Amino acid sequence: MEFKKVAKETAITLQSYLTYQAVRLISQQLSETNPGQAIWLGEFSKRHPIQESDLYLEAMMLENKELVLRILTVRENLAEGVLEFLPEMVLSQIKQSNGNHRRSLLERLTQVDSSSTDQTEPNPGESDTSEDSE
């Protein structure tokens, strides 16, 4: 497996997600303190996809350097707070989710097996109901 490649791609995805969360938090704050700038941020975010966080921030640098600095600060603070808990939390949630999916799959497999067995093998002592109705 390519653990290093997967880790790098995961880090990029997490970076973009933390940028999104920072923008969301700042937008909420601005809606209370500076509604005009909150509207501007919303419009900017519609024009520039935040999924590519580095491109998003580079585009914003051309229009609003102060807001970029605020996003960078909030994103870094979020990262510091989240990354402390993340490894253990992710592993725990994946193990729990995998267990739930395996249990569900096993239940479905046993239901399919028992229903196909019921259809092919009549229970002893049961008579064919079509003969009784004649």
Curated annotation (Swiss-Prot):
Disulfide bonds: none annotated. One of its GO terms (cellular component) is cytoplasm. One of its GO terms (molecular function) is protein homodimerization activity. The keyword Cytoplasm applies. One of its GO terms (biological process) is ribulose bisphosphate carboxylase complex assembly. Residues 111-122 have a biased composition (Polar residues). Changing R102A: No longer assembles RbcL8, no active RuBisCO formed. Gene3D superfamilies: Chaperonin-like RbcX (1.10.1200.210). The keyword DNA-binding does not apply. It comes from the Bacteria. Its main location: other. Coiled coil: none annotated. Keywords: Bacterial microcompartment, Carbon dioxide fixation, Carboxysome, Chaperone, Cytoplasm, Photosynthesis. Residues 97-134 are annotated as: Disordered. Homodimer (RbcX2). Interacts with the exposed C-terminal peptide of RbcL ('Glu-459-Asp-468'); binds 2 RbcL peptides per RbcX2, stapling them into an RbcL2 dimer. A slightly longer peptide binds with a higher affinity, but no long-term stable interaction with RbcL is detected. Contacts a second RbcL monomer via its peripheral polar surface. An RbcL-specific chaperone. Required for assembly of the RbcL8 core, acting downstream of the major chaperonin (GroEL-GroES). Acts on newly folded RbcL, has a transient dynamic interaction with RbcL and is eventually displaced by RbcS. The central cleft of the RbcX homodimer (RbcX2) binds the C-terminus of an RbcL monomer, stabilizing the C-terminus and probably preventing its reassociation with chaperonin GroEL-ES. At the same time the peripheral region of RbcX2 binds a second RbcL monomer, bridging the RbcL homodimers in the correct orientation. The homodimer has 2 functional domains, a central cleft essential for production of soluble RbcL in which the RbcL peptide binds, and a polar surface which plays a role in correct RbcL subunit arrangement. Belongs to the RbcX family. This is RuBisCO chaperone RbcX. It comes from Picosynechococcus sp. (strain ATCC 27264 / PCC 7002 / PR-6). The gene is rbcX.
